[in-house]
Amino acid sequence: MQMTAPKSPTPSLVEYVEAEIIPRYDSFDRAHGTDHVRTVIRRSLELAAHYDVDTDMVYAIAAYHDTGLVAGRERHHLVSAEILAADSRLARWFSAEQLAVMCDAVEEHRASSKRPPRTIYGRIVAEADRQIDAVTIVRRTIQYGLDHYPALDREGHRARCLEHLREKYGEGGYLRLWIAESENARRLEELRALIRDTPRLDRLF
């Protein structure tokens, strides 16, 4: 696919999302706050430029993708889809058929999913959500641990962080990449090199 310049979503949709959806991320842990959702939106629009897709749909899927964290992490992808489906105001910009595709994409974005997303919209947001910057991922993992496991000491946080990194990003880990045009494959190899380099990894704690 030949990349074109990323298109901008409809201003009225952006205004609604900025006022009603983005602020929801303020209550989530630091690894999934407003900086995270804005990054996923930006990366989704960049990836969408490689494909013949609806920019507004891509934008909204990215904006809603983690809203379900309000109900906890385990079912957040399902709850996020429920939140999107229940938002009657989205009918101003999207048809029922579009909303169904969007709900599926939100539901299927989770990194631990064993199957690829069924549509290009799902693959775009899933790939955009995989922000594979080695140092950033380690720091986000540490932040998540500090927020959710405050009783752990330094060594406990280090052990939890290493376990998570290996389980998700290591060789044989559950992370899957879905978009060929993404730079995530190269970045994943860089992260795996960092995971193997224990002295360097320890310096990030």
Protein language model regions, located:
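An amphipathic alpha-helix signature
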Residues: 10, 14-18, 41, 57, ...
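An active-site-proximal "capping" alpha-helix that borders the catalytic cofactor pocket
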Residues: 40-44, 75-90
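Divalent metal-dependent phosphate-bond-processing catalytic cores, especially two-metal-ion Mg2+/Mn2+ enzymes
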Residues: 5-12, 26-53, 64, 113-205
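Small/polar-rich, solvent-exposed N-terminal microdomains that initiate assembly or binding
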Residues: 18-27
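His-Asp-centered metal-binding catalytic motifs of divalent-metal-dependent phosphohydrolases/nucleases
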Residues: 55-72, 76, 80, 101-110
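Hydrophobic, well-structured mid-protein blocks that either form specific transmembrane helices
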Residues: 82-115
